[in-house]
A protein has these predicted regions:
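Hydrophobic alpha-helical segments, especially N-terminal targeting/anchoring helices
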Residues: 50, 160-161
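Low-complexity, intrinsically disordered terminal/linker segments enriched in charged
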Residues: 2-16, 138-152, 166-205
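Short structured motifs
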Residues: 31, 105-108, 141-142
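Hydrophobic/aromatic beta-strand elements that line small-molecule binding cavities or substrate pockets
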Residues: 107-112, 153-159
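A solvent-exposed, acidic/Ser-Thr-rich amphipathic alpha-helical stretch
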Residues: 43-133
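Structural motif
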Residues: 115, 161-163
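Short, low-complexity N-terminal intrinsically disordered segments enriched in polar/charged residues
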Residues: 1-52, 200-205
Length: 205
């Protein structure tokens, strides 16, 4: 398997090709734009897909050890719940994760549910994580600057505001064992798909 950023929206784009319902097509396009603007490190475009005061909720947070909304809080590997609420806090989170490219992950989507009020994706998440981040979690690594691969099950829900058609929030459910053994999975250049950093497509209907 090659790490591939296009994996994150591949099933959504395939569904968009066949979906006839106008509202569902709009919802799919909004989620594609949201995900791909994250990957493109475009905070303004990411925020444009959200309501005025959005939230990000993460259960067994994939961001534990890499983003802590409460300044000075102790890093914990298996953070059971994290909530980032309001435009200022959510933008601050995206500024950080986009700067560090923390959303540059490979998501093998196994299930996709598209409804008028919510889109759900589930599958296997492959998360490139720095040695420095793993060290914060108490792992022993031979190179803090190198990237290591976390692997775990992942579910993400995108609920919509019915009036605006924008995303109310993002609800993320992460396998708490995602980083177990990650220090043994050091990523090599050959593990990435060709042009890994240049394949983001923001153009959607």
């Amino acid at each position: 398997m090659k790490l591939d950023l296009k994996s994150n929206t591949r099933m959504l784009r395939e569904r968009l090709k066949t979906e006839k319902n106008a509202l569902l097509r709009k919802n799919i396009s909004t989620v594609i734009r949201h995900i791909e603007s994250e990957i493109a490190n475009d905070v303004d475009m990411t925020m444009s897909t959200l309501v005025a005061e959005p939230s990000i909720r993460s259960y067994f947070s994939s961001l534990a050890g890499r983003y802590e909304p409460n300044q000075g809080s102790q890093v914990r590997e298996h953070e059971s719940y994290m909530s980032v609420d309001g435009a200022v806090a959510v933008r601050g989170m995206y500024d950080m994760v986009c700067e560090k490219k923390l959303v540059w992950s490979h998501f093998d989507v196994h299930n996709l549910v598209v409804d008028t009020h919510c889109i759900v994706q589930s599958g296997l998440f492959h998360v490139p994580t720095t040695g420095a981040a793993l060290k914060e979690l108490g792992r022993s690594v031979d190179d803090e600057a190198a990237y290591y691969l976390g692997i775990g099950n992942f579910v993400v829900m995108f609920p919509f505001d019915e009036k605006s058609g924008l995303l109310l929030r993002e609800d993320i459910y992460v396998d708490p064992a995602t980083y177990q053994g990650a220090e043994k999975r050091k990523i090599k250049q050959g593990d990435y798909s060709p042009n890994y950093e240049k394949i983001v497509e923001l153009a959607v209907e």
